């Protein structure tokens, strides 16, 4: 394989290209086992929607071994740039972590990110010393603008959050990947490991998955399967795919094939 192939985000080096979310799991035990099976090193948590520390019982941060994972608080549930900035600041105060997965989503039906609000919040948070990983639609112009303000990655969606519809934005993703100066992490909508493999084959640097694992019949098994899909996709990208052709091309050489008489033609 490719032992020196690593992912660098915000000055930190990772060997796994699979990020995992912590929502929707039936309990913390299943979540922990899925994280372990996935081999992930970056774990995202929704600051507005969970009890990070819960007096009298185990909270989410208590359930995570933070010596093993880079915590990535996210601003899920924030509808405006101002809300997202406020939640990011609260997350840093609560966790001591200056990483943030920036989500500004005013649309409750399709959960599509607001490009203007995202860029506005990103500029503020980068200026305050955050390592910002913004969730966006696959828009190459927006991606470059986020790079310019100092975002550590860009995270274009594959399809709507939680839909499991797979990589429906492939052509647009290619425009984001073309000339990208920061890691591109495909986020949202991936349903099965082959979706993750497809994203990595296209040149994405990593993927983030949550619902596809948490809602699987066997979340731990699916987490392991996604890890293998990511590894396969990345290995295929590095190996370089064959050129596509519009016509058939025989895999066996014609040279050296004996010229046999046509049985329909009398000798």
Swiss-Prot record:
Function field: Catalyzes the rearrangement of 1-deoxy-D-xylulose 5-phosphate (DXP) to produce the thiazole phosphate moiety of thiamine. Sulfur is provided by the thiocarboxylate moiety of the carrier protein ThiS. In vitro, sulfur can be provided by H(2)S.
Enzyme Commission number(s) from the entry? 2.8.1.10
Gene Ontology BP annotations: thiamine diphosphate biosynthetic process
**Catalytic activity, reaction form:** [ThiS sulfur-carrier protein]-C-terminal-Gly-aminoethanethioate + 2-iminoacetate + 1-deoxy-D-xylulose 5-phosphate = [ThiS sulfur-carrier protein]-C-terminal Gly-Gly + 2-[(2R,5Z)-2-carboxy-4-methylthiazol-5(2H)-ylidene]ethyl phosphate + 2 H2O + H(+)
**What is its quaternary makeup?**
Homotetramer. Forms heterodimers with either ThiH or ThiS.
Q: Name one GO molecular function term.
A: thiazole synthase activity
What are the alphabetically sorted keywords of the record?
Cytoplasm, Schiff base, Thiamine biosynthesis, Transferase
What protein is this chain from? Thiazole synthase
């Amino acid at each position: 394989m490719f032992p020196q192939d690593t992912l660098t985000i915000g000055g930190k080096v990772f060997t796994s290209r699979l990020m995992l979310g912590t929502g929707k799991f039936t309990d913390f035990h299943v979540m922990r086992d899925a994280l372990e099976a996935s081999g992930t090193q970056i774990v995202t948590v929704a600051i507005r929607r969970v009890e990070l520390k819960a007096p009298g019982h185990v909270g989410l941060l208590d359930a995570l071994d933070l010596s093993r994972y880079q915590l990535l608080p996210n601003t899920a549930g924030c509808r405006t740039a101002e809300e997202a900035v406020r939640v990011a600041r609260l997350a840093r105060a609560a966790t001591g972590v200056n990483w943030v997965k920036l989500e500004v989503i005013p649309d409750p039906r399709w959960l599509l990110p607001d490009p203007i609000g995202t860029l506005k919040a990103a500029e503020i948070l980068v200026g305050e010393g955050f390592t910002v990983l913004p969730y966006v639609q696959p828009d190459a112009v927006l991606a470059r603008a986020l790079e310019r303000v100092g975002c550590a990655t860009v995270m274009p969606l594959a399809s709507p959050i939680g839909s499991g519809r797979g990589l429906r934005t492939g052509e647009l993703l290619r425009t984001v990947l073309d000339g990208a100066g920061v890691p591109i992490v495909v986020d949202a909508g991936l349903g099965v490991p082959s979706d993750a493999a497809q994203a990595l084959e296209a040149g994405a640097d990593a993927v983030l998955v949550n619902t596809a694992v948490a809602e699987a019949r066997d979340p731990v098994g699916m987490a392991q399967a996604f890890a293998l899909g990511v590894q396969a996709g990345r290995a295929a990208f590095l190996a370089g795919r064959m050129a596509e052709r519009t016509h058939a091309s025989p895999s066996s050489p014609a040279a050296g094939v004996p010229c046999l008489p046509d049985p329909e033609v009398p000798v």
